[in-house]
Design a protein with these regions (language model features):
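Conserved beta-hairpin
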Residues: 12-25
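Conserved beta-strand-loop-alpha-helix junction that forms the acyl-donor binding cleft
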Residues: 66-84, 101
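Conserved catalytic-core motifs of GNAT/GCN5-like acyltransferases
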Residues: 93-101
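Conserved, charge-rich beta-strand/loop surface module that forms ligand/interface-binding patches
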Residues: 5, 23, 77
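Short glycine-/small-residue motifs
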Residues: 25-26, 32
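Conserved acyl-CoA
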Residues: 49-71, 88-94
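Active-site rim helix/loop that mediates acceptor-substrate recognition in acyltransferases
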Residues: 1-12
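A short, internal acetyl-CoA/4′-phosphopantetheine-binding micro-motif in the GNAT/acyltransferase core
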Residues: 18, 32-57, 77
Length: 101
């Protein structure tokens, strides 16, 4: 199922997060330097480790004005208070809140 999903969504990089050989989440990087972070039960340690791994193993794509920023960023649903808190505690800096109408 995951293989088919990844084939349908050609991310720049996609990885399953394992704990004791059991999947507990995923993360992916896209060509616009966005990071998708999907963790079943996020913790400060786990979020920090994933962000550290990304920073140590990847570089953001070159900036394209108004399309691709020169840094990585994570979009988090507004109602996901826990992940928002964990990212702030990991020294991630909030840059925007988006609204749909």
């Amino acid at each position: 199922e995951h293989y088919a999903f990844v084939k349908r969504h050609p991310y720049q990089f996609w990885m399953m997060i394992l704990e004791d050989d059991c999947p507990i989440g995923t993360f992916y990087l896209q060509k616009d330097n966005s990071i998708g972070l999907n963790i079943l039960e996020p913790s400060q340690h786990l979020v920090s480790e994933v962000l550290r791994y990304i920073k140590e193993n990847f570089k953001p794509f070159k900036e394209i004005k108004s399309k691709v920023p020169p840094y990585f960023y994570v979009n988090v649903p507004y109602e996901n208070e826990k992940l928002n808190e964990l990212l702030l505690d990991s020294e991630a800096m909030p840059i925007q809140i988006s609204y749909k109408f």
